[in-house]
Swiss-Prot record:
SUPFAM superfamilies: Homeodomain-like. Signal peptide: none annotated. Residues 2-62 form the HTH tetR-type domain. Keywords: DNA-binding, Repressor, Transcription, Transcription regulation. It holds the Pfam family TetR_N. GO terms for cellular component: protein-DNA complex. This is Uncharacterized HTH-type transcriptional regulator YerO. It comes from the Bacteria. One of its GO terms (molecular function) is DNA binding. Residues 25-44 bind DNA.
Length: 289
């Protein structure tokens, strides 16, 4: 990443944390960076694109640090590795507090499918990292409860970070809190080993994210090419396809076209309709479509 792009990301995160994502304008970011608004658009096509790049920058850095710890401490006791990984998260909190504050205090994920998919992917990767670390640390005996234990471990870490956000005077040492959390995980594992209750969460809680816009556009093209469809269905698919290519698809139009597709006897059309509805930005429960 070039120096100017990195400066824009760091400046924007500081402004987002201070003013809020919605209230911060591109002009303010550009002015704070000492560049023109046009120069901003040379690096990012929108504020949402900037946010996605910022998430990839900071979260990617943190995930790489966690993986590097695992590699660097290969051969060390597994719980020591896990302790270092937990401590690294609190070090990241200290070093990149503005970004963590933004994540914890504001709903920063706008109606942008790329950002939602990115966060879903990161959540799956973090859960996988924790599950593997917990299994190696505590053995196969916890496998039945490993999904619940991963949720509890991540919940403890995030809860302490929340406390640190809302109490700015609280200064917690990363090594001290990571050792404390490992002891609490020991307690949880001991309790689970005696439990006769069924796990709350299944191992496969994270299903693949619904198809994104690019995949849907490809699927629409295939259906139009390979099916003999009535004209009204083809026109409706054309309109949906056109809307999906826009940065901000118009929901009322897509809603109307989805109504046109309802009740067809074509399995591929029905599958497409279900996929479009599965996109959270078009989910009727979330966006009144």
């Amino acid at each position: 990443m070039n120096e100017k792009k990195e400066r824009i990301i760091k400046t924007s995160i500081r402004l987002f944390a201070k003013k809020g994502f919605a209230a911060t304008t591109i002009q303010e970011i550009a002015s704070e960076c000492g560049i023109s608004k046009g120069a901003f658009y040379l690096h990012f096509k929108s504020k949402e694109a900037l946010l996605l790049s910022a998430c990839e920058y900071y979260i990617g850095m943190s995930m790489n640090k966690m993986k590097n710890i695992e590699e660097d401490l290969a051969g060390k006791p597994p719980k020591e590795v896990l302790k270092k990984q937990i401590g690294a998260q609190f070090e990241d909190f200290r070093d990149h507090k503005d970004f963590i504050v933004l994540l914890l205090t504001e709903n920063i994920i706008p109606e942008n499918q790329e950002i939602k998919q990115y966060f879903y992917k990161v959540t799956m990767e973090t859960d996988k990292l924790y599950r593997n670390a917990l299994l190696v640390s505590y053995g196969e005996g916890i496998e039945r409860y490993v999904a619940d234990l991963s949720i509890m471990a991540r919940g403890i870490v995030h809860s302490y970070m929340n406390v640190m956000v809302f109490n700015g005077e609280l200064n917690i040492d990363a090594e001290e809190i990571s050792a404390f959390i490992i002891e609490r995980l020991d307690d949880l594992v001991q309790g689970l080993s005696r439990s006769a209750l069924n796990p709350i969460v299944s191992k496969d809680i994270f299903n693949p994210m619904p198809a994104g816009k690019d995949q849907l556009l490809e699927d629409i093209q295939k259906v139009k090419e390979n099916s003999t469809l009535p004209e009204d269905i083809t026109v409706s698919l054309d309109v949906i396809e056109e809307e999906l290519t826009q940065d901000k698809p118009r929901k009322p139009i897509i809603k109307g076209m989805l109504s046109n597709l309802a009740g067809t006897n074509d399995k591929e059309v029905e599958r497409l309709r279900a996929l479009i509805l599965s996109l959270s930005q078009f989910d009727h429960k979330k966006s009144s479509l």
